[in-house]
């Protein structure tokens, strides 16, 4: 068992919410599910959900400039051959102004959370201006 598995926890309720998020039926709409690490308990807990996004930039507008977050994103896009694809990826939001103790907590939790949430692609952002449709499209293709 890795040290991260002993250090961090995630409740069954939160895992069910992540599964529900992953299995949404409406794949043509962008959604974001925001999670945070409770500093005291080291539990990963929900911090909000943004539904029916018009653009990924709306996610950036919701983020704090001092608090890191894990954001699961269901992102409808067209493949090079024109088919609709809805990849699930994670934005690892770690703003430059984050206190060092929080930076270390989130850095330690990142790979563990990526594994338990079964997300294979991670887009790292330190500035809200990094989260753009162009940057995400380039990242996913």
Swiss-Prot record:
GO terms for biological process: actin filament debranching; negative regulation of Arp2/3 complex-mediated actin nucleation. CDD domains: ADF_GMF-beta_like. It comes from the Eukaryota. The keyword Cytoplasm applies. Its main location: cytoplasm. It is found in: Cytoplasm; Nucleus; Cytoplasm, Cytoskeleton, Actin patch. GO terms for molecular function: actin binding; Arp2/3 complex binding. Residues 6-141 form the ADF-H domain. Keywords: Cytoplasm, Cytoskeleton, Nucleus. One of its GO terms (cellular component) is nucleus. PROSITE patterns: ADF_H (PS51263). The keyword Nucleus applies. InterPro entries: ADF-H, ADF-H/Gelsolin-like_dom_sf, GMF. Pfam families: Cofilin_ADF (PF00241). Coiled coil: none annotated. Belongs to the actin-binding proteins ADF family. GMF subfamily. PANTHER family: GLIA MATURATION FACTOR, GLIAL FACTOR NATURATION FACTOR. Actin depolymerizing factor involved in the control of the disassembly of actin patches. Binds and suppresses the arp2/3 complex functions such as the promotion of actin polymerisation and branching filaments. Associates with the arp2/3 complex. This is Actin-depolymerizing factor gmf1.
């Amino acid at each position: 068992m890795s040290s991260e598995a002993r250090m961090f926890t995630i409740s069954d309720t939160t895992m069910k919410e992540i599964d529900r998020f992953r299995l949404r039926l409406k794949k043509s709409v962008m959604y974001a599910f925001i999670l945070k690490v409770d500093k005291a308990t080291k539990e990963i807990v929900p911090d909000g959900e943004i539904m029916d996004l018009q653009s990924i930039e709306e996610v950036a507008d919701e983020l704090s400039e001092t608090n890191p977050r894990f954001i699961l994103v269901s992102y409808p896009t067209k493949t090079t051959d024109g088919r609709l694809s809805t990849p699930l990826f994670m934005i690892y939001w770690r703003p430059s102004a984050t206190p060092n103790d929080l930076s270390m907590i989130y850095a330690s939790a990142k790979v563990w959370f990526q594994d338990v949430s079964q997300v294979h692609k991670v887009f790292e952002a330190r500035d809200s201006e990094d989260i753009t449709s162009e940057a995400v499209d380039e990242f996913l293709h």
